[in-house]
């Protein structure tokens, strides 16, 4: 259709959606049981926000895109539950205490990319530190 027949107000803006944490192609989407629950809770929150924004097309489309992103992560999730396997091995889901460069003890947990939160001591299994351990 020629632009001459299109009203200015008919043009929908494409929402810019920030990508989720990087998960390289071919890398399994490992998640802890807690991580999967957090993804599901995030999805529920987004769906509620989407319902509340039915009249705001731009916000509605933005939330739809976010829901599609999270659905992709939930559908590709591979649950790894090592929480009760405390045999001294460093593995996905394990809490690890180590001495940092300043000889201070630090405790971290190795988790999936979406659950990673350095402030709370949770690092991605893809991080250099997790790989080094």
Task: Pin down the residues of each PLM region.
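Helix-rich terminal scaffold detector
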Residues: 1-73
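A short linear-motif detector with a strong N-terminal bias
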Residues: 8-10, 16-17, 24, 74-77, ...
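Homeobox/homeodomain signature
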Residues: 13, 20-21, 64, 69, ...
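Broad hydrophobic/π-residue packing in well-ordered secondary structure
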Residues: 36, 76, 108-111
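Non-DNA-binding regulatory cores of transcription-related proteins
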Residues: 81-133
